[in-house]
From Swiss-Prot:
Broad class of enzyme this protein falls into: transferase
Sequence similarity: Belongs to the tRNA nucleotidyltransferase/poly(A) polymerase family. Bacterial CCA-adding enzyme type 3 subfamily.
Phylogenetic classification of the source organism: Bacteria, Bacillati, Bacillota, Bacilli, Bacillales
Origin species: Anoxybacillus flavithermus (strain DSM 21510 / WK1)
Name of the protein this chain belongs to: CCA-adding enzyme
Additional remarks: A single active site specifically recognizes both ATP and CTP and is responsible for their addition.
Keywords: ATP-binding, Magnesium, Metal-binding, Nucleotide-binding, Nucleotidyltransferase, RNA repair, RNA-binding, Transferase, tRNA processing
Annotated binding of ATP, by residue: G27, R30, R111, D154, R157, R160, R163
Assembly and oligomerization: Homodimer.
Length: 397
């Protein structure tokens, strides 16, 4: 048992002292067994939410209707959830009701995949009623019980399956894959925002190429926003070996390959801020196809986005990325954005004694370009002289 679990032991031990069962469950146990970095630690217990809140001094009822209470111990938050079973699902996405139970097995039985239905007690002993450990050894993603039932309960589980393929490099069991092929259309009942969360994780996984290939093989792509006609583009995307390093690069590379623009991205319900970043990368990639296309003007315009653009360019055009070299060139520019100019609009209004207007923005752009191309030093007095000279249209400015 590693240090993160040892820190959380006090929560388990406290619950047990009060006569309740308690176990580590979920992704943390799975990742511990895979010797991967562990995220948040979740605990399942026979104690009901009110009992949990009565036992611990610092709690937050984050999802009390579904049995979840946040317990804060030594400054660390743990989600403690009552053993439960779920009633009939509505709209292919959520149970109509949940019933608290006292059985760990019943709780594990409601989970999506066998690898996520493993529990661990305070001694580090594994409780695995559905063969999750063997699935981990075989590197297989399989549902708990009948995949048709699991996917009809919550259709988003099909996207989660492919997301785990991308993150872990596992394969789908034959039954799970066949069920995705058969029930993929149920994704149409799921909110785009929920799909986008899973799809983004898929795009960022180290085995994204494998997951994209499965997206095509299972025909699940046909039920994702704006992708029904993009089979060939997705096949092309699955051939790239470079793994995106962050969400901007992941979405921009995806959007570039499948020819998405603003409207298609908006239909994925992405934030305006993220869409802006993606569109900047797409604009650059329309012009920058080789290293020689990184002109001084391109470096200046896209500087902060160089790592994203260059890695996408290299992946798409089968080249080696030159991020470090380009960033050094960008850093050596006389200015890296307009705010670094030693003169501003107010200075120019005083200098020329004129009211603002189109002339002012044109003058600032001219000064900006002149400094960038080292036609004049970025010093206020020299810029004033250059501006006066430029205003008179003299050739020796």
């Amino acid at each position: 048992m590693n240090e993160q679990f040892r820190q959380a032991l006090s929560v388990i031990e406290t619950l047990k002292r009060h006569g309740h069962e308690a176990y580590f469950v979920g992704g943390a146990v799975r990742d511990y067994l895979l010797q991967r970095p562990i995220g948040d630690i979740d605990i399942a217990t026979s104690a009901h939410p009110q009992e949990v809140m009565a036992i611990f001094p610092r709690t937050v009822p984050v999802g009390i209707a579904h049995g979840t209470v946040m317990v804060i111990e030594r400054g660390i938050s743990y989600e403690v959830t009552t053993f439960r079973k779920e009633g009939r699902y509505e709209d292919y996405r959520r149970p109509k009701d949940v019933t608290f139970v006292r059985s760990l097995n019943e709780d594990l039985q409601r989970r999506d995949f066998t690898m996520n239905a493993i529990a661990m007690n305070e001694y580090g002993e594994i409780i695995d009623p559905f063969g999750g450990v063997e699935a981990l050894k075989q590197r297989i993603i399989e549902t708990v019980g009948d995949p048709a039932e699991r996917f009809n309960e919550d259709a988003l589980r099909m996207m989660r399956a492919l997301r785990f393929v991308s993150q872990l490099g596992f394969s789908l069991s034959t039954e799970t894959k066949q069920a995705i092929i058969r029930y993929g259309h149920l994704l149409q009942h799921i909110a785009v925002e929920r799909i986008a969360v899973e799809f983004e994780k898929l795009l960022l996984g180290p085995f994204v190429s494998k997951a994209i290939a499965l997206l095509v093989e299972t025909n699940l792509f046909a039920y994702l926003p704006e992708l029904a006609t993009k089979k060939e583009e997705l096949i092309k995307l699955s051939s790239y070996s470079l793994v995106p390093v962050d969400r901007i690069e992941a979405w921009a590379r995806f959007a570039f390959v499948v020819h998405f623009h603003r409207e298609q991205l908006k239909n994925w319900k992405l934030s305006n801020h993220l869409i802006r970043d993606i569109l900047i990368c797409l604009k650059a990639l329309e012009h920058i196809r080789s290293l020689t296309d990184w002109t001084i003007d391109a470096l200046y315009e896209y500087g902060p986005y160089i790592p994203h653009i260059e890695r996408i360019r290299a992946a798409v055009y089968d080249d080696k990325p030159s991020v470090h070299s380009l960033l050094k060139q960008w850093e050596m520019l006389p200015i890296r954005n307009r705010k670094e100019l030693a003169i501003n609009g107010h200075d120019l209004l005083i200098l020329f004694g004129k009211k603002g207007g189109p002339w002012l923005s044109e003058m600032i752009e001219n000064i900006e370009r002149a400094v960038l191309h080292r036609q004049v030093e970025n010093e206020k007095e020299k810029l004033k002289e250059w501006a006066m000279c430029n205003q008179k249209r003299e050739n020796n400015c």
